[in-house]
């Protein structure tokens, strides 16, 4: 779902070519937010079929045609709904969470707080589960300690974000 959110978010700032959408996302968020052609173009076609975006074909002499995509009012509504929707299943996914944080400017205070609270609850559950594990070897203990540390660090970050929203 994060690919759809990023794609529509990119179009909220104006019409763009597919390649431009891909490059802008990677330039802003880095390579951790994978968006390859096999993800981008099927999503663009699906959104076009839904009426969420429009496509204008720009003919080029001696070159392949280029498609310019723009978001519609329906697309804006779909984008807002997708961004706000953050069920527990999605909240366990790091990228889904980080994409929503990156787009916090598009959410109001209550929506931001809800995203952070849902993720915080998930992390507390994960921490409880990890703490109950039986570490029967040195390396398992290392993995458990690393996982606890990562979760605790993210919980501190969420606490910090709560003060900034």
Regions from the language model: what does each represent?
Residues 1-90:
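Basic helix-turn-helix/winged-helix DNA-binding cores
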Residues 165:
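Inter-helical turn/loop segments and adjacent helix faces that build the functional surface
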Residues 80-125:
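Amphipathic alpha-helical dimerization/coiled-coil segments
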Residues 98, 130-136:
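A surface-exposed regulatory interaction patch that couples sensing to output
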Residues 39, 67, 139-148:
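Alpha-helical scaffold segments that form or flank carboxylate-/histidine-based iron centers
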Residues 113, 120, 124-127, 134, ...:
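Heptad-repeat amphipathic alpha-helical coiled-coil interaction surface used
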């Amino acid at each position: 779902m994060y690919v759809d959110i990023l794609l529509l978010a990119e179009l909220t700032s104006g019409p763009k070519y597919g390649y431009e959408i891909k490059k802008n996302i990677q330039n802003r968020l880095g390579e951790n937010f994978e968006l390859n052609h096999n993800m981008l173009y099927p999503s663009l076609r699906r959104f076009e079929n839904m009426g969420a975006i429009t496509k204008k074909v720009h003919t080029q002499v001696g070159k392949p045609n280029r498609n310019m995509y723009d978001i519609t009012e329906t697309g804006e509504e779909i984008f807002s709904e997708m961004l706000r929707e953050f069920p527990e299943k999605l909240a366990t996914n790091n990228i889904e969470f980080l994409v929503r944080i990156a787009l916090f400017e598009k959410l109001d205070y209550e929506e931001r707080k809800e995203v952070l609270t849902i993720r915080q609850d998930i992390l507390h559950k994960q921490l409880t589960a990890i703490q109950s594990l039986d570490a029967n070897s040195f390396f398992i203990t290392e993995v458990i300690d690393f996982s606890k540390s990562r979760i605790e660090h993210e919980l501190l970050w969420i606490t910090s974000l709560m003060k900034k929203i």
